[in-house]
Amino acid sequence: MASGMRRTGRELAIKIIYSFDGTGSVEALLATFWSNFRFRDDVLGEPLEDSSQAVAEPVREFAEDLVRGVAENLEKIDGLIGEFSTNWSLERMARVDLAILRMATYELLGHLDVPVSVIINEAVEIGKRYGTKETPSFVNGILDRISRTCRPVVAS
C-alpha cells in the first residue's frame, strides 16, 4: 500500500480510537464510524475531502487493523505509555495525544515490518495536524522511549 494511503488509514484509525473508551464492542464502534463517514463532517468535525467518495478498501482494512489491535492490546499499550510518559498519567493526557500514542504503540508492537522511524514520524505528523503545538514533541519523546525497549535495533 502506498505511503499516502497508509497515512490516511492511520488518520482514520486515530479518529476511531479517539472515540474508543475501552468498553463496548469494537465492531459496533467501527460500524458506527463508517456509517457516519458518509456525512460532510467526520467524527472529529473535520470536513471530508470528498464526502461522496468511499474509502479505498486497503485503507479501510489498515485502519480497522490498527483499531482492533489497539482494542485487543489496550492494557499492554496503556501500560507502556504510562511507564514511559514521565510525570504524565493517561488521565491527564489530551485525548488526541493518547489516541495517537495508542495507535503508534500498537504499530510498534504489531507491525514489525514497518520501520520504527516511519511509525514515529507518521505519529508526529498526525500530531501536528490534530494535536496542539506540544503534541509532536510529546508524542515523539514517549514513542522514542517505547521503541528503544520494544523494538531495539539489532546489531549486525
Curated annotation (Swiss-Prot):
CDD domains: Terminator_NusB. One of its GO terms (cellular component) is cytosol. One of its GO terms (molecular function) is RNA binding. InterPro entries: NusB-like_sf, NusB_fam, NusB_RsmB_TIM44. Keywords: RNA-binding, Transcription, Transcription antitermination, Transcription regulation. The keyword Transcription applies. It comes from the Bacteria. Gene3D superfamilies: NusB-like. The keyword Metal-binding does not apply. Pfam families: NusB (PF01029). One of its GO terms (biological process) is transcription antitermination. Belongs to the NusB family. Involved in transcription antitermination. Required for transcription of ribosomal RNA (rRNA) genes. Binds specifically to the boxA antiterminator sequence of the ribosomal RNA (rrn) operons. This is Transcription antitermination protein NusB. It comes from Syntrophotalea carbinolica (strain DSM 2380 / NBRC 103641 / GraBd1) (Pelobacter carbinolicus).
